[in-house]
């Protein structure tokens, strides 16, 4: 059996990476995917780098036993903490990470602040500092740590008064400012895009899933393992919580 038929592994600290999986299924309809959410240990964003690195490697080892042909780390925090080490250790498969989509936000050339919403760990890591340094000459970039937001989404709260209250509280310091764009620096956050848009009217909201999947496509092509069959691929969703509720939420968010 050809390696091309082997699944692509997509991992995250919980249900957030489903936003990347969704984009991947759209762009790569003939690929098979295995998604693994580590909700038992979520959120990663408030843990130490070493903890996140260890958790990430544990999940990857599980997926390698299922013969994945490529790995997508669909978690900004895990990418910040472990992507270089993963690429170093697993040289035989393409390993794709995700980072906040600052470049497209800067390229909009809109007046005002670019607000990066992300977990505390993503914003404090060297990888993000380097990314910021690349663009802060051109734009005013504001870091907005969002502790607690991942937990709300993991509980299935993606709309309604509780979410609105959380977001209004986060944005209150910027009500009078010109905002050029919001950048969603965590794969959980696209699921509350509608709620963000309802508060931050007419401000572009950008996430990195499209760019990540385009990079995945390029790598599959480069390794000559792109599946261009005619049969729609299969999707398997796994979660460390082993709880039907979290699996139901995952399928609901995938919304196929």
Curated annotation (Swiss-Prot):
Residues recorded as binding substrate, renumbered to this chain, are 12-13, 44-45, 76-77, 187-188
Q: What is the annotated role of this protein in its UniProt record?
A: Provides the (R)-glutamate required for cell wall biosynthesis.
Matching PROSITE patterns, A to Z? ASP_GLU_RACEMASE_1
In which organism is this protein found?
A: Clostridium acetobutylicum (strain ATCC 824 / DSM 792 / JCM 1419 / IAM 19013 / LMG 5710 / NBRC 13948 / NRRL B-527 / VKM B-1787 / 2291 / W)
Gene name in the database record = murI
**Which GO terms fall under biological process for this protein?**
cell wall organization; peptidoglycan biosynthetic process; regulation of cell shape
Q: Extract the InterPro entries matched here.
A: Asp/Glu/hydantoin_racemase, Asp/Glu_race, Asp/Glu_racemase_AS_1, Glu_race
- Output this protein's name: Glutamate racemase
Q: Which NCBIfam families match?
A: glut_race
Q: Which PANTHER family match?
A: GLUTAMATE RACEMASE (PTHR21198:SF3)
Q: In which pathway does it act?
A: Cell wall biogenesis; peptidoglycan biosynthesis
Residues at the catalytic site: 75, 186
């Amino acid at each position: 059996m050809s390696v091309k038929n082997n699944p692509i592994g997509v991992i995250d600290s919980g249900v957030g990476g489903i936003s990347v999986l969704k984009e991947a299924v759209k762009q790569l309809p003939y690929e098979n995917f295995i998604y693994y959410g580590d909700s038992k240990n979520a959120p990663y964003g408030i843990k130490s780098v070493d903890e996140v690195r260890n958790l990430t490697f544990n999940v990857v080892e599980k997926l390698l036993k299922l013969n994945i042909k490529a790995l997508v780390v669909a978690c900004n925090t895990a990418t910040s903490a472990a992507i270089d080490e993963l690429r170093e250790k697993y040289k035989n498969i393409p390993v794709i990470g995700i980072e906040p989509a600052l470049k497209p936000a800067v390229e909009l050339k809109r007046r005002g602040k670019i607000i990066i919403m992300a977990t505390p760990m993503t914003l404090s890591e060297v990888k993000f500092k380097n990314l910021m340094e690349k663009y802060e000459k051109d734009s005013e970039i504001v870091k907005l740590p969002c502790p607690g937001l991942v937990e709300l989404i993991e509980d299935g709260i993606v709309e309604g008064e509780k979410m609105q209250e959380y977001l209004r509280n986060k944005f209150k310091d910027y009500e009078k400012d010109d905002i050029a764009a919001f950048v969603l620096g965590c794969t959980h956050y696209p699921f509350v895009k509608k709620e963000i848009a309802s508060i931050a009217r007419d401000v572009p909201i950008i996430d990195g899933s499209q760019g990540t999947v385009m990079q995945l496509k390029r790598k599959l092509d480069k390794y000559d393992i792109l599946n261009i069959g005619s049969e729609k691929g299969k999707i398997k969703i796994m979660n460390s919580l082993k709880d039907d509720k979290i699996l139901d939420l995952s399928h609901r968010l995938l919304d196929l």
